[in-house]
Structure formats: C-alpha cells, structure tokens
Amino acid sequence: MPVPAPTDRDSANQDFAENAVAESDGAKGSPAAGAALTPPALLERLAAVQGMGPGRRRLVVLLPQLGDFDSLEYAQALAGALPQLEAAGIALLAIGIGNQESCERFCAFTGFPRERLLVDAEPQLHQALGLYAGLTQAGGPWPNLLLMCAGIGSPGTLAEVLRGYTGDRSAPQRIADDETIQAGPLPPIRGSFFARAGGSGFLRPFELATVRLQNMAEVLGHWRTYVPRDDFLTQRGGTFLLEADDSLLYRHLDQGILGFSATMARPLGFLDPWMG
C-alpha cells in the first residue's frame, strides 16, 4: 500500500515538535514571538472550544496526569490568578490527562474552574506538540517515574524539592497565618506556625513542602480517580500564550517533574508583560 504524502498540517506540526525538542534542551521558557508559529494541532483543538478562537489573548496549559504534582500545583496558582487574567482579557484553558471523574475531583480540590478544563484519556495533543514524554526506559512507567523523582531525566527536580523545605525569600507566602492546613498524616497545622518558625511575607521553610504533602495525600487517597491509567505517568506538559491573531507570545516546555514554570518562585511571572 503506498504511503500517503505528508500534508502541510503534518509538516507544520513536525516542525514545531522538532523546535520544541530543541528548545527543551535550552531555555525552558521564553517569549516566542518570531521564534515559532503556533502549531496547527493546538489551533485546531482551540477552534472546537467556545471562547478560545482568535480575537483575544489565550493562555493554554497542557497538564500532565491530573494526579501529577505539577498539575495540582499549577492549577492552584492559576485558580488564584483568575481575577487578574480576566481583567487582562486573557482567556484560560487547561487540557490534562484523565477522565471526567478525575476532572471533577481535580477541580473541586484545586479550585480550578470546571468549564476551563478539558481531559484526554491519552496524551495525543501532548505528543503532537512534541512535549517531553519523560523517561521511557525498560521497566514501565513506575520505575521511570521514580527515577525522575530522583532527578534522573528530570533536571531541576531535586533543587525544587529542596526549595520546598528550605523556603525562598523571593517567593510569596503560601499559607495565611489564620489558615489551617491538613497535610496527610500530620495533625492540622495553623499558618501561624510558619510565621513563628520563619517570619511572614515570603515562602517560609517547610511551607511549600507542606502544601505539596497535602496535594500528595489527596491524590494517593483517590489514586484511581486521579490517574485512571498508569501508562502516562512520566508525560510532561507545556504552556502556550497566544495573541489575538493566533501568533505565539510565549511558550514553556516542561523538562521534568516540578518544572511547569521557568520561574518556580513565581510560576505565573511570565504573564507580567501582558497583565497590565
């Protein structure tokens, strides 16, 4: 049987995927104007979503599995920035790996708006965009995930884990002094505990680690809801900011676990030039 010739769309997506892979070896996030066109596969997906067509700026986030550390932490940051995004006229859409049940629980826990999240059973769009699939060594997804958690094939992961324990004076405070947080097996923790331990107005020691422990406890307690299949545990995501004319203003291609932003101290800092 003759092999069909590649279409213009296939060529454009392949060009972007190759560029995406090349970028993943260099800067993780950068203004993309003049560097790359918005891939047709992404534009086609957006064309089918009400309110995500041309005519306004759009922030499109491709999440890994909904039970992934990055997915929950990124969604929590985005949920807190919704008023600012709306004021800046930026429409938001996230696309994650999961199903409707995982979508419902994910949104209820993170506060991310249900109408702004789409789920795919398989990462076909991730693959079309050339996003990093993570380690794919022999042994299956679980050994590969554990290796990535140890920093193998996942640059920056260990440093980011450590930051969660040591604190970061360049990052904002995560837990209000009057807030109570339940993190897994630990007793309820008042936000004032972190103030006594390290002050206030910045990310205190153990503060981010406590938030991540709370996220992990939520996922592990409802594992098959969040992760219906283990096949794509290592798949990473990406961020795309589109101009009203469909040109690409910014992109970030995740290189590893806890790498959903080029500036994890301020994960949404890349939006500053467009937030007014």
Residue map of PLM features:
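Conserved helix-turn-beta segment immediately C-terminal to the redox Cys motif
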Residues: 73-94
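Thiol-based oxidoreductase modules, predominantly thioredoxin-like and allied folds used
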Residues: 89-102, 115-121
